[in-house]
From Swiss-Prot:
Residues 1-25 form the signal peptide. It comes from Homo sapiens. The lineage of its organism: Eukaryota, Metazoa, Chordata, Craniata, Vertebrata. Keywords: Secreted, Signal. This is Epididymal secretory protein E3-beta. It holds the Pfam family RnaseA. It is found in: Secreted. Gene3D superfamilies: Ribonuclease A-like domain (3.10.130.10). InterPro entries: EDDM3A/EDDM3B (IPR042402), RNaseA-like_dom_sf (IPR036816), RNaseA_domain (IPR023412). Possible function in sperm maturation.
């Protein structure tokens, strides 16, 4: 009897550790996506500059081009939520219903500065197995945004 309790206790402890690792993996991919692509609406869209964004983010320093999206944190968090609100899309591609503001940065030949293009785009996001956005898959530009 005591040995079976030890086995069940060990299995329960291992299950708890596994669950913790799964939660942390979701947080890492979600956090990385937000760190690399998110522009907060707390500032005006025109205030964001590619040279500053690409220089400040360590993960983007060696990239020749990158894309940022200007959307509320709440909306990004709920992109992978189905109509049921209790369910999340898992390992699925989801197009947003309304166009979003996008800032694209392209490195120029001098490698010290970036050109910027701003536009409204429909965006297709990938929802991870955890049910949270982990990447941008496709864009359809609606119209450019003038400076």
């Amino acid at each position: 009897m005591a040995s079976s309790l030890k086995i069940w206790g060990t299995l329960l402890a291992l299950l708890c550790i596994l669950c913790t690792l799964l939660v942390q993996s979701k947080e890492v991919s979600w956090r990385e996506f937000m760190k690399q692509h998110y522009l907060s609406p707390s500032r005006e869209f025109r205030e964001y500059k590619c040279d500053v964004l690409m220089r400040e983010n360590e993960a983007l320093k060696d990239k020749s081009s990158h894309m940022f999206i200007y959307i509320s944190w709440y909306k990004i968090e709920h992109i992978c939520t189905s109509d049921n609100w209790m369910d999340r899309f898992r390992n699925a591609y989801v197009w947003v219903q309304n166009p979003l503001k996008v800032l694209k940065c392209h490195q120029e030949n001098s490698k010290n500065s970036y050109t910027e293009s701003r536009s409204f785009n429909y965006i297709e996001f990938h929802c991870s197995m955890d049910g949270y956005v982990d990447s941008i898959e496709d864009l359809k530009m609606v119209e450019p945004i003038g400076n």
